[in-house]
């Protein structure tokens, strides 16, 4: 379970991350990352699972899986960052392992520094 202090709750917070954040997309999810305006010490995460993903049972299952994936990786997410994870319709058919692997890959792409992207 993702502790409440690490969750994004207000729609204005979601909108700020979606507007100002960097974005990378995969087959199952889209991850947005932005710097927090507040002085909270840890990262915050929010989840968007729209009706195009499936019915209520499917959407809630995907949301629970995504929350569990992010909660297990709180130590890896940089402090004072906000993340929004948006599920795509293909996420309904994805396994937990596929969602976790894709989140790790996309988060890695977002958190790379410009120095590590240079040529050797």
Swiss-Prot record:
InterPro entries listed in its UniProt record: Ribosomal_Su5_D2-typ_SF, Ribsml_uS5_D2-typ_fold_subgr, RNase_P, RNase_P_CS
Keywords: Endonuclease, Hydrolase, Nuclease, RNA-binding, tRNA processing
Keyword Lipid biosynthesis belongs to the record: no
UniProt catalytic activity: Endonucleolytic cleavage of RNA, removing 5'-extranucleotides from tRNA precursor
GO MF term list: 3'-tRNA processing endoribonuclease activity; ribonuclease P activity; tRNA binding
Transmembrane feature ranges: none
Subunit note: Consists of a catalytic RNA component (M1 or rnpB) and a protein subunit.
Family under the similarity heading: Belongs to the RnpA family.
NCBIfam families: rnpA (TIGR00188)
Function noted in UniProt: RNaseP catalyzes the removal of the 5'-leader sequence from pre-tRNA to produce the mature 5'-terminus. It can also cleave other RNA substrates such as 4.5S RNA. The protein component plays an auxiliary but essential role in vivo by binding to the 5'-leader sequence and broadening the substrate specificity of the ribozyme.
Protein name per UniProt: Ribonuclease P protein component
Native species: Acidothermus cellulolyticus (strain ATCC 43068 / DSM 8971 / 11B)
Taxonomy of the source species: Bacteria, Bacillati, Actinomycetota, Actinomycetes, Acidothermales
Gene: rnpA
